[in-house]
Regions:
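A solvent-exposed interaction/effector surface
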Residues: 2-176
C-alpha cells in the first residue's frame, strides 16, 4: 500500500515538474514588446512604447468577456497558421485590448522579425495589420483574471493617482 502511495506521489511530482518546465519555457521564450520605464512609483509606472507592427480585430462588444473571446479566437487562428502562407507566428506579450461604448479592439504585437512586407497575410479580412503609434502609457497592475469589475476598479484607481500627482492624461484606457 505504501509503495502504491509512493508511486502516485512520484507520478504527481513528475507531472508537476513537466508542467512547471513547460510554463517556465513558455514564459521566458515569449517575445515581449520593448518599452522603456519613464517613471516608476510604488503603485503605477509610466512607460514609453515605440511603434510596433500589430494585428488587430475590431468588435462591437462593450465588455471584457465578449471582446476577449471573439478577438482572441480570430487573432489566434491567424498566428496558428490561418494566413495565406500557412505560417505559424510566435505569440508575443502583451495582448492589447481597448474597450469603449463605441466599439472595441484586440491587438497582438507581431514578433520583431516581421515587417509589413514579410508578415503573412491573414485569411480573415477583418484582421487589420498596421503599425501602432509610439505612445506613453500609465500602467497599473492587478492580480488574478481580468473582469469588467476589476478593470473598472483599476482604472478608477489609476485616474485618481494620476490626478493627485497632477499628471494630465489624453485618451481612454487599454488593457495590456
Amino acid at each position: 500500500k505504501s509503495m502504491k502511495s509512493l508511486s502516485i506521489i512520484l507520478l504527481l511530482g513528475a507531472i508537476y515538474f513537466v508542467f512547471q518546465s513547460f510554463m517556465s519555457k513558455y514564459l521566458f521564450e515569449t517575445e515581449k514588446q520593448v518599452y522603456r520605464v519613464v517613471k516608476k512609483e510604488a503603485d503605477f509606472e509610466i512607460r514609453y512604447y515605440p511603434e510596433a507592427l500589430m494585428a488587430t480585430v475590431y468588435s462591437k462588444g462593450t465588455n471584457y468577456k465578449s471582446v476577449a473571446s471573439s478577438g482572441f479566437n480570430k487573432l489566434a487562428k491567424f498566428i496558428f497558421g490561418g494566413n495565406q502562407q500557412k505560417e505559424s507566428i510566435s505569440m508575443t506579450a502583451p495582448v492589447r485590448m481597448s474597450i469603449t461604448d463605441n466599439g472595441s479592439s484586440m491587438s497582438f504585437v507581431m514578433p520583431k522579425k516581421y515587417n509589413n512586407q514579410s508578415l503573412p497575410t491573414p485569411n480573415d479580412p477583418n484582421i487589420e495589420i498596421k503599425k501602432s503609434l509610439p505612445e506613453y502609457v500609465a500602467v497599473i497592475s492587478f492580480g488574478g483574471y481580468a473582469t469588467d469589475e476589476k478593470i473598472a476598479v483599476a482604472y478608477q484607481n489609476l485616474v485618481k493617482i494620476l490626478s493627485e500627482k497632477k499628471i494630465i492624461t489624453k485618451g481612454g484606457y487599454k488593457l495590456l
